UniProtKB/Swiss-Prot annotation:
Catalyzes the attachment of alanine to tRNA(Ala) in a two-step reaction: alanine is first activated by ATP to form Ala-AMP and then transferred to the acceptor end of tRNA(Ala). Also edits incorrectly charged Ser-tRNA(Ala) and Gly-tRNA(Ala) via its editing domain. Keywords: Aminoacyl-tRNA synthetase, ATP-binding, Cytoplasm, Ligase, Metal-binding, Nucleotide-binding, Protein biosynthesis, RNA-binding, tRNA-binding, Zinc. This is Alanine--tRNA ligase. Its EC number is 6.1.1.7. It catalyses: tRNA(Ala) + L-alanine + ATP = L-alanyl-tRNA(Ala) + AMP + diphosphate. The keyword tRNA-binding applies. PANTHER family: ALANINE--TRNA LIGASE, CYTOPLASMIC, ALANYL-TRNA SYNTHETASE. NCBIfam families: alaS. One of its GO terms (cellular component) is cytosol. Belongs to the class-II aminoacyl-tRNA synthetase family.
């Protein structure tokens, strides 16, 4: 039975038992800052379990993509070394939201394993929480598990909680006895060791309590079920193999690596490990990028980069000199297309991103490995086993070696890293990372918003059709804490039952305006949307006292809203134009829409040419002039996608979505505010196009009055330039070309004159030559010559000096310049680089070069004479030392 068949039969089994099959969510958690990646099947149902979200089903089943690499669940360093560790895996699960409980959950699991999968009952063992008599009795009496195979365990192994507070409950694990051959010895047993004889297959979590902050647990009115079973693990068991890497889900990727490398799996232990690493990391890489993560130096992108670079290093160990991971990542998506068709459609995009990252790392990998090898040899010579933290930091900062990659390489040399020293070097970067991922204060405020939502606060948005409205004030936050009233001058956050103010989301900034209630007047400077149905107005009380329970009049700043709406519609037109000009691979990777300007990030693999930018700008303006109507409506998500609506990479959408259509030009899923017609935008002007990450470009642009102002500023600049060179705007280009041609002519004349001057100066310098220990020495000061001019003069002197040493000094534009030249026959006795360093130190600078020619600069031209006066003594000392 293949892994694909097991996945299908699992979902079909639970569908036949009244469960709704829910597709896997993206690997990027939606609206959950506490989670780096989706790492369990229940993640996408978290708000349902917490009662914050209602679904139209009470039973669900899924096969969920998961990644564990970073944070609490970090399996990265073990991947490839063991039979079970993965960064990417699939979790099969069934869930009940207040519907069935232990009896049905246990029965479903037992029937699937013993009847659907045909596993022998006498090989299955079960653990329960030591105090969960109910589950124990169900297993024993309902399923007939003998007590010798029914084990009570403690809280560490068999009690699950979502956090320090909230839903929690006992769990029950189903294990399979794989036989004596898998035993670790006489002490082998459940709860006694971690070997694979008794292999955990399925964990059934019974959410039946709510834990308070003081630790008190009270029964939930509607207990729920959350179960999880690793697809790779059950597939390995069903296929009778002892390692997950030998099941067909991963063995096919390993076979592909065998084909590419020309090496056979099983012939060499080190090569086998590298193949396992590449197989696993290719899956994580492919699906993370397909879901919108890009390699970077922070957050999720840095975890992805660590995974990719570890895989690249193992590819090198297999003998690959050129990029190869882009090929294995493509193979992964194509081979898993039946289960995950959408990521497979992005295979070309994924391959390009992976190849770019691989090429960048390969350029520095050899240099980094050389430095690391030298350090290891030095440590061995000193009988030391700890790599200094600053060396590990240099490898990270200069050569892009993540710390765990360095540790991975050193493990085979029995060398560890001074992690405290590394952390000290990383302090500045760590501080930036903390700011990026938000501090505990912001997390606490986020908790306040959730608390308000749990207490029933929610906001209806009325701002699509109106810019004013009245509503009750539900909550006031002062310094992040709820208060019943706030005085004039206070900076507050206000939650109302309804609002016309748009809350920042989807890249569009929040509205500004005013709020009035009783005698209070509030200036609203921003509107946030921390939760899907909670709008928070940020502002300062200008007068009076604001109180909860009052009816407020809310008025949106019409001009700002209109400008923002125009920019948002222009962003949709821009995306459509980019697709038309650059190709279908263009996808939105982010955006920012403000009243002043718009910013659009998109997938593309090279800088846009001036011609491409002009075509895009022209196309957008053509569509503005078409004055196409902008239509918005709600529809089923599936229908919108079927009709061709564009969605944002990795974004989570509900069953109902809002679709914004601009004529026949653009159709996108979007919750933002828009113009009534494209003609309202007036004018579109691109300000700049830049690269922000591998395969991601950014365009910044303005519209309407702002665009007109940019054009006027450009015209004014042209007029000023024309006036400066005494012409008019129509003749500006021709006049500039003539000036540039004249400049080149003058430069050639100057160069010719300089050559003649150099010849004269060279003659004068040669006449001043002295002899030191039998060597001819020419030393002189020639001011107002830059570095290039000094070299040209030196060439003239050397051509006429058959054997000797030349030293030149020049004061130029407030700096000191030095040049030392030594004829080839003398370089074994006297080196130009050594002499110029000594002289440069006297003029407050430094420099160097070849044994026969070296230059230096300094900040103290007033010391030049003293430096040149020291030349005879320095040459004499150098000759005597030789």
């Amino acid at each position: 039975m293949t892994g694909n068949e097991i996945r299908s039969r699992f979902l079909k089994f639970f569908q036949d038992h009244g469960h709704t099959v829910v597709p896997s969510s993206a690997l990027i958690p939606h609206n959950d800052p506490t989670l780096l990646f989706i790492n369990a099947g229940m993640n996408q149902f978290k708000d349902v379990f917490l009662g914050r979200e209602k679904r139209d089903y009470v039973r669900a089943t899924s096969a969920q993509k998961c990644v564990r690499a970073g944070g609490k669940h970090n399996d990265l360093e073990n991947v490839g070394q063991t039979a079970r560790h993965h960064t990417f895996f699939e979790m099969l699960g069934n869930f009940s939201f207040g519907d069935y409980f232990k009896k049905e959950a246990i029965d479903h699991a037992w029937k699937f394993l013993t009847e659907e999968m045909g596993l022998p009952k006498d090989k299955l063992w079960v653990t329960v929480f030591r105090e969960d008599d109910e589950a124990y009795d169900i297993w024993r009496d309902q399923q007939g598990i003998p007590e010798e195979r029914l084990i009570r365990m403690g809280e560490k192994d068999n009690f699950w909680s979502m956090g320090d507070t909230g839903p929690c409950g006992p769990c029950s694990e189903i294990l399979i006895d794989q036989g004596e051959s898998m035993s670790c010895g006489d002490e082998c047993g459940i709860g006694k060791c971690d070997c694979d004889r008794y292999l955990e297959l399925w964990n059934l979590v019974f959410m039946q309590f709510n834990r308070d902050a003081d630790g008190t647990m009270t029964p939930l009115p509607k207990p729920s079920i959350d179960t999880g079973m690793g697809l790779e693990r059950i597939t390995a068991v069903m296929q009778g193999v002892q390692s997950n890497y030998d099941c067909d889900l991963l063995r096919g990727i390993i076979a592909h690596v065998e084909e590419l490398s020309g090496k056979r799996y099983g012939d060499n232990a080190e090569h086998d490990m590298s193949m396992r690493v590449i197989a696993d990391h290719s899956r994580a890489t492919a699906f993370l990028i397909a879901d919108g993560v890009l390699p970077s130096n922070e957050g999720r992108g840095y975890v992805l980069r660590r995974i990719m670079r570890r895989a690249a290093r193992h590819a090198k160990m297999l003998g690959f000199a050129d990029p190869v991971l882009y090929r294995t990542a493509t193979f992964v998506l194509q081979s898993m297309a039946e289960a995950y068709p959408e990521p497979a459609q992005r295979a070309d995009y994924v391959a390009k991103i992976v190849k770019i990252e691989e090429e960048r790392f390969i350029q520095t990998l050899d240099n980094g490995l050389r430095i690391l090898t030298e350090e290891v040899e030095r440590l061995k010579a000193a009988n030391a086993t700890v790599l200094p933290g600053d060396v590990a930091f240099k490898l990270y900062d200069t050569f892009g070696f993540p710390l765990d990659l360095t540790a991975d390489i050193l493990r085979g040399e029995n060398v560890t890293i001074d992690e405290d020293g590394f952390e000290a070097c990383m302090e500045e970067q760590r501080q930036k990372a903390r700011e990026h991922w938000k501090g505990s204060g912001e997390e606490a405020i986020s908790g306040i918003y959730r608390q308000l939502a749990e207490e029933g606060a929610r906001t209806d948005f009325t701002g699509y059709g109106e810019l004013t409205g009245q509503s009750e004030i539900l909550a006031i936050l002062l310094d992040g804490q709820p208060v019943s009233s706030a005085p004039a001058g206070a900076k507050v956050e206000i939650v109302t039952a309804a609002t016309p103010f748009y809350g920042e989301s989807g890249g569009q900034t929040g509205d500004c305006g005013t709020l009035a209630a009783g005698d209070a007047e509030v200036t609203i400077t921003d509107t946030k949307k921390p939760l899907p149905e909670l709008f928070v107005h940020v502002g300062e009380i200008a007068a009076g006292t604001l109180q909860t329970g009052e009816t407020a009049t809310l008025t949106v700043d019409r001009e700002r809203r209109q400008a923002t709406a125009l920019n948002h519609t222009a962003t949709h037109l821009l995306q459509a134009a980019l697709v038309e000009v650059l190709g279908e691979h263009v996808k939105q990777a982010g955006s920012l829409v403000t009243p002043e300007r718009l910013r659009f990030d998109f997938i593309h693999f090279s800088a846009m040419s001036a011609e491409e930018l002009e075509r895009v700008e022209t196309l957008v303006n053509c569509r503005i002039r078409e004055n196409a109507g902008v239509d918005t409506r709600e529809m089923d998500h599936e229908q919108a996608v079927a009709e061709g609506a564009t969605a944002l990479f990795g974004e989570k959408y509900g069953d109902k979505v809002r679709v914004v259509r601009v004529g026949d030009i653009s159709m996108e899923l979007c919750g933002g505010t828009h113009a009534n017609a494209s003609g309202d935008i007036g004018l579109f002007k691109i300000l700049q196009e830049t690269g922000i990450a591998a395969g991601v470009r950014r365009i910044e642009a303005v519209t309407g009055a702002k665009a007109l102002q940019v054009v006027r500023d450009q015209e004014r600049t042209l007029d000023d330039l024309a006036s400066l060179i005494k012409t008019d705007r129509p003749q500006l280009e021709a006049r500039l070309r003539k000036l540039l041609e004249r400049q080149k002519e003058l430069e050639r004349e100057i160069e010719s004159l300089q050559g003649k001057l150099n010849a004269d100066q060279a003659g004068d310098l040669l006449q001043q030559a002295t002899e030191i220990d039998g060597i001819s020495v020419v030393c002189g000061r020639v001011d107002n010559l830059d570095g290039k001019a000094l070299r040209e003069l030196a060439d003239q002197v050397r051509d006429r000096l058959s054997s000797g040493v030349l030293i030149l000094g020049s004061a130029h534009e407030g700096k000191a310049g030095l040049l030392v030249a030594v004829t080839k026959d003398l370089t074994k006795r006297l080196q130009a680089g050594a002499l110029v360093k000594q002289l440069a130190a006297m003029v407050g600078g430094g420099g160097g070069g070849r044994p026969d020619l070296a230059q230096a600069g300094g900040s103290k031209p007033e010391q030049l004479d003293e430096a040149l006066a020291s030349v005879p003594q320095r040459i004499s000392e150098a000759l005597n030392a030789a």
